């Protein structure tokens, strides 16, 4: 476990955590009954744990609020978080670890997941910053509102709508956020537009800045009413 620091100086990350098994790059999607060989493969902590580790590597004190499995796969994730200096004292221990297999091809990823998005309730002292998705913020609205009144800066991610309804009522949590980060598909679907720039402006109408992530095409942001476009750096998938 990471050394404890005061909550007021911490980044709190809230969301489901996964053991990610990542392989690629593939020339195309897998073909049933055939074996495809790739150059790269790794196992890492994904989901909220990935965000927590990224912040820890930047030198930020991080507290992760999530569920971690007590099985072998969960122990692997727990050990990785400990090595990275992430505070897991607020994590709930459950039987099975969430697992995702991620395959990279055509400049993006295809994922298959076993597990659940269920999470423990938020609580405790207000952190300096909170990273969570809109569902997590909505489920803990009283706590998040209380934290924000005490100065917590809130980053809200959006969530894929499996039902395809894209109900804007699901985004009410953005009204207590400082910035939101939908991906391109989510942004276009919620805003009912085919323009990423217009979608970014629409999300900003909730009262927060918006950064739309566009995969290999970088990001489009609406900050203080201005549209900014930033290309993605070249990296190996």
Question: Where do the model's predicted regions map?
Answer:
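Ribokinase/PfkB-type carbohydrate-kinase core domain
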Residues: 2-17, 63, 79-93, 104-229
């Amino acid at each position: 476990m990471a050394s404890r620091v005061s909550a007021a100086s911490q980044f709190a990350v809230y969301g489901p955590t996964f053991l990610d098994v990542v392989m690629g790059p593939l020339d195309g999607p897998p073909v049933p009954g055939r074996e495809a060989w790739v150059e790269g493969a790794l196992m890492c902590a994904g989901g909220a744990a990935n965000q927590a580790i990224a912040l820890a590597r930047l030198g930020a004190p991080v507290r992760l609020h999530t569920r971690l499995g007590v099985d072998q796969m969960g122990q692997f994730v727990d050990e990785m978080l400990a090595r990275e200096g992430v505070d897991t004292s607020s994590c709930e221990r459950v039987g099975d670890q969430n697992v995702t297999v991620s395959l990279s091809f055509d400049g993006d990823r295809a994922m298959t997941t076993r597990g659940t998005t269920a999470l423990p309730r938020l609580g405790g002292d207000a952190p300096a910053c909170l990273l969570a998705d809109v569902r997590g913020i909505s489920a803990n609205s009283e706590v998040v509102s209380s934290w924000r009144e005490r100065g917590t800066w809130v980053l809200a991610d959006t969530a894929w709508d499996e039902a395809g309804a894209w109900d804007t009522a699901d985004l009410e949590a953005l009204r207590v956020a400082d910035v939101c980060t939908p991906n391109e598909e989510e942004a276009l679907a919620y805003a009912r537009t085919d323009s990423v720039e217009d979608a970014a402006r629409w999300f900003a109408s909730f009262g927060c800045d918006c950064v739309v992530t566009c995969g290999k095409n970088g990001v489009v942001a609406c900050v203080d009413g201005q549209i900014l476009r930033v290309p993605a750096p070249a990296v190996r998938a």
